[in-house]
């Protein structure tokens, strides 16, 4: 099935200015006229700075402000899913009245954006997106962190995402004995998920930007049968402005504004920091349609691709949707005219953000409707 929906909304989001993280570019050290002090050579939105001596400086602050509307109705808690790497997950469940009497709820595994270099489940923007999804879909949402570049270049993020889905499988099915996870026992996590009414048969893998890239590769990794996830069924994939690049620039890239939220300069910086040594933007994890990438095949469940009409990555995103459909996948492409990259995560409470949530809900509700259709005389 192939459906294209164009959403034309009048609201426009302006990027928020942000001061670089400390330290600022240092001057030469006192008493040393021959050696220059380490200085900033790469800066990612003031959140990550790489110094000339190779060290990195990270700020805990988010690069843009998002209104805090956490009123406590959505219940959430943190856990650690990868103790060796210190990686956490934030788990959300709808208000109790949304859970009671409505049957099992779908699961939404969510991976944040940030060019594989910045981002956190704890960022207010990521937290707000997940609050909305949990309350309004409604769904049990799990927002996973992953290792970031340049300290951990690709494929570290994708390896962590696969570990995250396996961790979720084990906690939903009790396949591993309870072990301390750093913020409570596995038994606590299992009990929390069980009390959420989560349905292991309706898992949607999702993400924004770099996280949407991860969501695609989890679809490719686990395949149509959900191999390796046991009784957990992948019902679909929600890709919001996926970060797919290509070595050859596309028309949407060439025509993008220099002051866009995701400009060519910013995208190049992320690529320099995230790609493995010697790789270019056709690296298979960055370009699923590249010359060295495995062919696209059938994935578990349907695919939703959300695109901003002014996103410099638009052409690669649309081409991806077309190719996925051509090999037999059920793909829905939704284009938000006039919107730049990151329009949802930067302002999740806007009317545009509300429309994104409605699009995702309709997409997920289709799966619920399909499940109740009789097949071969059975339900």
State what each model feature region is:
Residues 1-27, 94:
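Intrinsically disordered, low-complexity basic segments at termini and long loops, enriched
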Residues 30-379:
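Alpha/beta-hydrolase superfamily serine-hydrolase fold, recognizing
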């Amino acid at each position: 099935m192939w459906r294209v929906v164009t959403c034309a909304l009048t609201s426009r989001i302006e990027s928020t200015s942000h001061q670089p993280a400390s330290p600022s570019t240092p001057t030469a050290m006192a008493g040393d006229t021959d050696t220059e002090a380490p200085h900033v050579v790469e800066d990612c939105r003031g959140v990550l700075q790489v110094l000339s001596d190779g060290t990195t400086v990270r700020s805990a602050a988010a690069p843009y402000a998002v209104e805090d509307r956490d009123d406590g109705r959505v219940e959430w808690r943190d856990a650690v899913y990868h103790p060796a790497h210190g990686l956490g997950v934030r788990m959300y469940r709808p208000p109790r009245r949304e859970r009671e009497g409505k049957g099992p709820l779908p699961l939404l595994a969510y991976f944040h954006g940030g060019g594989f270099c910045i981002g956190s489940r704890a960022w207010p923007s990521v937290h707000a997106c997940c609050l909305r999804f949990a309350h309004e879909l409604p769904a049990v949402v799990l927002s996973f962190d992953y290792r970031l570049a340049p300290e951990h270049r690709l494929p570290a993020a994708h390896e962590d995402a696969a570990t995250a889905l396996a961790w979720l499988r084990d906690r939903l099915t009790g396949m591993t004995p309870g072990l301390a996870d750093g913020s409570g026992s596995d038994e606590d996590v299992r009990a929390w998920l069980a009390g959420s009414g989560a349905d292991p048969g309706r898992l949607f893998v999702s993400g924004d930007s770099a996280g949407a890239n991860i969501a695609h590769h989890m679809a490719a990794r686990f395949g149509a049968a959900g191999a390796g996830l046991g009784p957990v069924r992948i019902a679909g994939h929600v890709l919001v402005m996926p970060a797919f690049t290509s070595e050859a620039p596309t028309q949407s890239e060439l025509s993008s504004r220099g002051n866009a939220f995701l400009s060519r300069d910013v995208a190049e910086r992320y690529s320099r920091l995230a790609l493995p040594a010697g790789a270019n933007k056709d690296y298979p994890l960055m370009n699923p349609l590249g010359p060295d990438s495995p062919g696209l095949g059938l994935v578990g469940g349907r695919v939703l691709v959300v695109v901003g009409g002014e996103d410099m990555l638009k052409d690669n995103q649309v081409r991806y949707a077309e190719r996925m459909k051509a090999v037999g996948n059920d793909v829905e492409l939704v284009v938000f005219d006039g919107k730049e990259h990151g329009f949802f995560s930067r302002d999740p409470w806007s009317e545009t953000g509300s429309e994104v949530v409605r699009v995702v809900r309709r997409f997920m509700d289709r799966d619920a409707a399909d499940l109740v259709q009789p097949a071969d005389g059975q339900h």
